[in-house]
Amino acid sequence: MFNKLNKINKIKNCFNKSIYQINYSSKPIFKEGITNVKLDRDNKDGTSDYIKLHDNVIMNTYGRVSDIVFTHGKDSWLYDMKGDKYLDFGAGIAVNALGHSNDGWSEVVANQSKKLTHLSNLYYNQPAIELAQSMIASTPIFDKVFFANSGTEANEAALKFAKKIGIAKGGVDKHEIIAFSHGFSGRSMGSLSCTHKSKYREIYGPLVPGVHFAEYNDIESVKKLMSKSKTCAVIIEPVQGEGGLEAATVEFMQQLYKLCKENDCLLIVDEVQCGIGRTGQLWAHTRFDTEKCKPDIMTLAKPLAGGLPIGAVLVSDKVASEIKPGDHGTTFGGGPLVCEVGKYVFERISQPSFLKEVQEKGKYLTDGLKKLKDQFPNSILEIRTVGGLFVGIQLDHNVSDLVSYAKSQKILIINAGDDVIRFCPPLTITKQEIDQLLLVLKNYLIKVNSNKK
């Protein structure tokens, strides 16, 4: 008994010593060369310090196209640590629809952040309900909304809904998806399975089975893959963003809708990048005539909250009636802060006068590009647009040099493949700012063509 008590006391003493040996007032031990690096946000010569630290603490998953560290933005302009300003024709890849630090947007963020930012979906919140009301009121096709946090999540939810309905109605074999060449649906496992580019897919196999790729705008290739007993959904971008701004034709989409209807499968339109005013229409799919092409599901994200993370899935009653509590969910989706901001952005963009301006500025940009094509027909091979401020130009060479040249002239543009430049500026961009872009493009083309002589 005495020995047992002695052992217990020894253990207690060791435990107590280990506690009291900790000096809680001392500074934590940090990794050398990481957290002891002194950074100064106001130092105009501090760009390299931030980039060096970035390389040490942030995973290398992005090929950064520049050595710029941005500090703030206003409207169509971004400002870096050195004090230089850049005209932004990428808008965060079609996200900042109202530009950077829009006054009304900033006011809504500030006001809502003082009230309620996050709640969870165990409870109701006013902004989510009001945003859903605005969105559903704007379309005759869709009846319910599911909120997510990104385009990938929106597409993932859409695919899950389609699979559940397909299996419930057609048995375990009716789970297959048809996607399209050059399409981009996202990077999570389900949406990645519907993304065509092999460099995104091949290192993560095996992916979700039963996904087949048809040729974009080729209805015969879809027919070869379609099966009434196996296909549960077709997912398609009305305008492909990553795929070089190729647009689906009206005839193809109407035939696709008819084919889906005949085979009892759902039609999903992915408007993550091309929706909410980007094409000059509120919804990109309305170009196909909603009487002859009536999608069952539409996914949205990028511009909806003007820079805050949000995604949305709009569905018909036919779909909504099959989805029950527990079939899908999200912790952050539909939060009061992002939905209040989304409500402001959506109601602003959906105004007819706003959309008319987008159409006019899109035409102004396209007309300017056509003039350049007339001047340099061997350099600009094609101009791609269905309207609005979502315009691509295909060049006869790799566009990386143009991206670098434009950056040197303080204009930011982004590619959509090796030979296509994608222009998706803030929808609030001015014609004077478009002129600045056109001048830089002209100077670049003069330079390229003089080097060919």
UniProtKB/Swiss-Prot annotation:
Enzyme class at the top of the EC tree: transferase
Xref: InterPro entries: AcOrn/SuccOrn_fam, Aminotrans_3, Aminotrans_3_PPA_site, Class-III_PLP-dep_AT, PyrdxlP-dep_Trfase, PyrdxlP-dep_Trfase_major, PyrdxlP-dep_Trfase_small
EC number: 2.6.1.11
Essential cofactor(s): pyridoxal 5'-phosphate
A Gene Ontology term for the protein's cellular component: mitochondrial matrix
Coiled-coil region list: none
GO biological process: L-arginine biosynthetic process
Keyword Mitochondrion in annotation: yes
GO MF term list: identical protein binding; N2-acetyl-L-ornithine:2-oxoglutarate 5-aminotransferase activity; pyridoxal phosphate binding
Pathway given in the UniProt record: Amino-acid biosynthesis; L-arginine biosynthesis; N(2)-acetyl-L-ornithine from L-glutamate: step 4/4
Localization, UniProt: Mitochondrion matrix
Catalyzed reaction equations: N(2)-acetyl-L-ornithine + 2-oxoglutarate = N-acetyl-L-glutamate 5-semialdehyde + L-glutamate
Positions where N6-(pyridoxal phosphate)lysine occurs in the chain: K302
Keywords of the record: Amino-acid biosynthesis, Aminotransferase, Arginine biosynthesis, Mitochondrion, Pyridoxal phosphate, Transferase, Transit peptide
Gene3D superfamilies reported for this sequence: Aspartate Aminotransferase, domain 1, Type I PLP-dependent aspartate aminotransferase-like (Major domain)
Pfam family, one: Aminotran_3
Primary localisation category: mitochondrion
Family, as annotated: Belongs to the class-III pyridoxal-phosphate-dependent aminotransferase family.
Protein name: Probable acetylornithine aminotransferase, mitochondrial
Species of origin: Dictyostelium discoideum (Social amoeba)
Gene: argD
